[in-house]
Design a protein with these regions (language model features):
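C-terminal accessory "lid"/substrate-recognition subdomains
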Residues: 178-203
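Post-Walker A alpha-helix
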Residues: 20-21
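Phosphate-binding beta-loop-alpha motif at adenosine-nucleotide cofactor sites
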Residues: 158-172
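ATP-dependent small-molecule kinase phosphotransfer cores
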Residues: 38-97, 104-107
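A glycine- and Lys/Arg-enriched "phosphate-lid" helix/loop adjacent to the NTP-binding pocket
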Residues: 40-45, 68, 91-96, 103, ...
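P-loop (Walker A) phosphate-binding loop of NTP-binding proteins
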Residues: 10-12
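Conserved lysine of the Walker
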Residues: 17
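Post-Walker A helix-loop "phosphate-sensing" segment adjacent to the P-loop in P-loop NTPases
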Residues: 26-34
């Protein structure tokens, strides 16, 4: 059985990352979205093990000590982490996993799982990104801060395997889907023991 692919997507705020991930999951039945752990309280409509694994802080800290996270961070006094066992079991079963995460988290996971695939999504221009952020009706100082953060994030794009420009949503989704197909066909991801009888007859 071919191994699953861990696909990590990063993008500046307002680039359409969430929409792209949702479209990918609708299109690719061989792809599963990674469920993260958090210590924050569930929001209305959120379900344990579907949207997040909701944990107490003490339990989360014990998991940190046991090395059960591929990466973790504290955001607004709440802990967030990517569970190692959830992803490793899916990949072993031949299921690819999609993970949307920031550049720091992506770098941390790449160090632990160098075979993961990193895809960075950018807007076509900074002006188009400004327009998207402004359309959200954020305060002007918030837009300026997000744009500054976006420039810093895009400087890290050189550390990724693929760069996708989200000028057209369907095109961007198709390009990422093609990347997943190609990566899944790599010889390094195949079970060569299982294929040995077939390969033995290849001249």
């Amino acid at each position: 059985m071919p191994k699953g692919v861990l696909v990590i997507i990063s993008a500046p705020s307002g680039t359409g990352k969430s929409t792209i991930c949702r479209k990918l999951l609708q299109r690719r039945k061989d792809l599963r979205y990674s469920t993260s752990c958090t210590t924050r309280a569930p929001r209305p409509g959120e379900k344990h093990a579907k949207h997040y694994f909701f944990l107490g802080k003490d339990e989360f800290k014990r998991k940190i000590q046991r090395g059960e996270f591929l990466e973790w961070a504290v955001v607004h006094d709440n802990y967030y982490g990517t569970p190692r066992s959830y992803i490793e079991s899916a990949l072993k079963a031949g299921t690819s996993v999609l993970l949307a995460i920031d550049i720091q988290g992506a770098a941390a996971i790449r160090r632990k799982m160098p075979e993961s695939i990193l895809i960075f999504i950018t807007p076509p221009t900074m002006e188009s990104l400004r327009e998207r952020l402004t359309a959200r009706k954020d305060a002007s100082e918030s837009v300026a801060k997000r744009l500054a953060n976006s420039r810093a994030e895009m400087a890290a794009a050189k550390n990724y395997d693929y760069l996708v420009v989200n000028d057209d949503l369907e095109t961007a989704v198709s390009e990422i889907s093609c990347i997943l197909t190609a990566e899944g066909l790599k010889v390094s991801r195949q079970d060569l023991v299982e294929l040995a009888p077939v390969l033995a007859h290849v001249n």
